[in-house]
């Protein structure tokens, strides 16, 4: 029994060492990939978005046709992603219009991009409501909604904030963050845009990321 144990201990030690080396290699590879990505896009970046591997992730939602879609279905080309709600009286329409204009400017640069609108008001924003909204703003726009849990999941993944105001009717407002996100299929989240960025600036910055990807 003791002899068998004596043979197992070295084998266990070798296995533990191999596992440790593998974990080190994985972590080191991630660090290298992040560094390469940071250097690759250094000339394009206007925000403090490095470390973007912590932003974004997998999700499952409904599109404007009521179909179940995932992040892999949505992010097939450069994507300009925005979180808002269709009943928003002022900020959302302006931001969504600007993002749609940026997509048009990118098209003039021979760059295809997709504008995506994620609702943070799933109770009112059904697929039918979302469909009318996105058709009004841009023919390529994808609208996403879902259950409360699904919306909460993607909001948490992208570090967004939203909170519906207390109301006794359906005319309530929703407080929410207003960042726009740039997603590249090969890299995920790479940059964000604040409200003070113009459509021209968003298009130029996006084009820089695409050229360097």
Regions found by a protein language model. Give the residues of each.
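Residue-level signal for well-ordered, solvent-exposed loop/turn and beta-edge residues enriched
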Residues: 65-67, 188
